[in-house]
């Protein structure tokens, strides 16, 4: 969610209709870098941002956690899954074996893929992991840059649909309830939460 999409409608409606001003806030909506808003918020360059519950796990744990906290869910369920062109024959996680997958190289991401593939009777070691350079899912799939991509349906899936791509898709939440985590979430800088609770509450 590093580019504006329908998941962010509420933020833009609040800005356009003056809800932020009514709450005594001056809100500037800025474009996050392609690697997400997390580092921007952690550095204090933004008070709030959009992230994902699963990707947060790797950087809020450990000996030097990133100083951010999820304060709200934008969507109550996980709307993500794996999309591929129909002619690749990937209708289930097991069938990802023998095909390429665009990975963000995150431990939790790859752990989810491994669990899904193995639980479905597939061989995770045969899933060819390619470091993801995907910025346009339609182009990446239609030109065979990669066979399968982890997407969030609310925009990337609809984008592929609008482009007329003939695709297969399976959602993680349908595979195992444990994967029905919040996506996406609103995060805040921990220092901001501690120092200005009233502002955070007003923003929400």
Q: Model-predicted segments: where are they?
A:
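N-terminal low-complexity, intrinsically disordered segments
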Residues: 166-167
């Amino acid at each position: 969610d590093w580019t504006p999409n329908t998941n962010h409608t509420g933020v833009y409606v609040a800005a356009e209709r003056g809800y932020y001003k009514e709450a005594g806030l001056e809100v500037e909506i800025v474009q996050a870098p392609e690697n997400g808003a997390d580092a921007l918020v952690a550095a204090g360059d933004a008070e709030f941002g959009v992230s994902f519950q699963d990707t947060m796990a790797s950087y809020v744990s450990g000996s030097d956690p990133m100083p951010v906290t999820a304060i709200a869910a934008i969507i109550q369920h996980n709307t993500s899954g794996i999309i591929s062109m129909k002619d690749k024959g990937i209708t289930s996680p097991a069938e990802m074996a023998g095909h390429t997958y665009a990975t963000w190289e995150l431990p939790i991401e790859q752990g989810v893929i491994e669990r899904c593939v193995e639980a479905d009777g597939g061989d995770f070691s045969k899933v060819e992991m390619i470091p993801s350079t995907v910025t346009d899912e339609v182009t990446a799939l239609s030109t065979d840059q990669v066979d399968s991509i982890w997407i969030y349906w609310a925009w990337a899936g609809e984008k592929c649909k609008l482009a007329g791509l003939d695709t297969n898709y399976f959602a993680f939440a349908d595979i195992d309830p444990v994967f029905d985590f919040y996506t996406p979430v609103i995060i805040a800088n921990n220092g901001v939460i501690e120092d200005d609770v009233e502002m955070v509450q007003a923003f929400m």
